[in-house]
Amino acid sequence: WFAQGQYTRPQSLQYGGDTLQQGPKMILDWLKKNLNNTKKVFGIDLHTGLGKSGYDTILVPDDIKEDKYNILVSLFGDHVSPLDPTQGVGYRITGDIHSGIVKEFSSIEWLTITQEFGTFGPTTVFKNLRAENRWTQNNQLTNEKDIMNHWSRKNLLNTFNPNNKRWQQDLISRGNTVFKSVQEYLSKLD
């Protein structure tokens, strides 16, 4: 499945690099400064691309403990789906940002989800990923602005953030609903 990152073929789709990238490093640095006395965290990783346009799926690891899975189902109902391609829009992964963060902060009790909002069908997503990768690997430009403004980059941006007001409103509305459900759940733990 092409959505999963890979770390062995630098010229291929979804190459994640051979070192910790700037974005995850910034997140880890922020967490190190701000989680000193934290005992419990509910992490939400927001993604776009997979699934029916405008619908969100709450993706959870296959190996999630039953009690945590039941908590998530009680919060999010039938939006919950394991990272299993035979059971929904998810796909099997080896390592993700959640597992890395949980490992780094092992003294904290974590409950993590990926909230995945669908955009376009898999053919459109793959076509636009491939076009942008081809441009990235083969362009001869040296001006960063020209490189970034290529049509393939704009198409890829639209693939994961559609220029569609209804879709954007659905994402904001459902994102707020999930966030508020988590806040309410956490407030009851105190």
Enumerate the language-model features and the residues they cover.
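C-terminal accessory segments enriched in acidic
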Residues: 1-190
